[in-house]
């Protein structure tokens, strides 16, 4: 649902309605995309930290108690690929990149991790709260209350271009509530109203990324290079159009070569 992040909430709402006593898990919380042969790399996808943050917060707003990013750590499968037309790289635009690097998406997921660390015990047993809202046409809002009375207000700006900066008037369980909402385009936040106090906090907080190492390793000097020319001797199997290697009983793509004959006129 990365193209419509607010649906993460509505879909979890539906699951909870169908199975109210069952936990709701998101096993593949989309946060990136694969790369294709001749196409764009994962890092060129527009899916960024806003999507990683928004989908997680909207899933929690719906009552999800299990989150698993797909993918959190990118990697490469040198023995083959995931599907036809895909590259062997599976960086997937993951928060922790294929080469071990991190960026703004990692910071976004780290911020979600802080929310879970601080409030996970309250959120998993929280209940949805009925509310009315005015002046928030481009917002998706979800409100939950923990057993101790702590209120969690989830907000997502669905507008892809315009920021949302205005007061939001809510009626929560019959009581008025006003929120000064400042959200960039496609951004999301969580307002925590602590029970029995006037204390409110905004999450996720800004995160600090690890510092890049100063003492870099020395470059590697290649002393010897070996070259092997293929002689193209092998068990050649006709491959009809539309057929894949597994359909021919070939399940190891590492050493497969292709040849074709072209008749010129």
Question: Model-flagged regions — what are they?
Answer:
Residues 5-15, 54:
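Alpha-helical scaffolding within the catalytic cores
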Residues 17-43, 47-265:
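Carbohydrate-binding surfaces of carbohydrate-active enzymes
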């Amino acid at each position: 649902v990365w193209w419509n992040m607010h649906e993460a909430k509505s879909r979890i709402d539906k699951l909870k309605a169908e199975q109210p006593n069952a936990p709701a898990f998101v096993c593949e919380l989309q946060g990136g995309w694969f790369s294709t042969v001749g196409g764009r790399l994962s890092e060129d996808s527009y899916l960024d930290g806003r999507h990683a943050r928004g989908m997680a917060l909207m899933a929690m707003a719906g009552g999800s108690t299990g989150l698993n990013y797909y993918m959190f750590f990118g990697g490469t499968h040198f023995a083959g690929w995931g599907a036809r037309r895909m590259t062997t790289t599976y960086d997937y635009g993951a928060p922790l990149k294929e080469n071990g690097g991190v960026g703004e998406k990692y910071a976004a997921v780290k911020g979600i991790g802080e929310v879970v660390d601080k409030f996970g015990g309250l959120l998993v047993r929280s209940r949805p709260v009925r509310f009315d809202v005015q002046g928030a046409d481009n917002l998706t809002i979800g409100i939950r209350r923990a057993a101790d009375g702590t209120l969690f207000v989830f907000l997502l700006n669905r507008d892809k271009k315009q920021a949302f900066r205005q007061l939001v008037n809510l009626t929560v369980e019959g009581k008025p509530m006003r929120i000064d909402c400042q959200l960039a385009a496609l951004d999301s936040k969580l307002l925590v109203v602590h029970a029995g106090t006037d204390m409110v906090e905004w999450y996720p907080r800004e995160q600090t990324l690890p510092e890049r190492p100063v003492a870099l390793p020395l470059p590697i000097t290649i002393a010897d290079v070996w070259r092997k020319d293929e002689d193209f001797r092998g068990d050649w199997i006709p491959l009809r159009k539309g057929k894949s290697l597994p359909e021919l009983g070939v399940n190891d793509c590492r050493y497969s070569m292709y040849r074709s004959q072209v008749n010129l006129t």
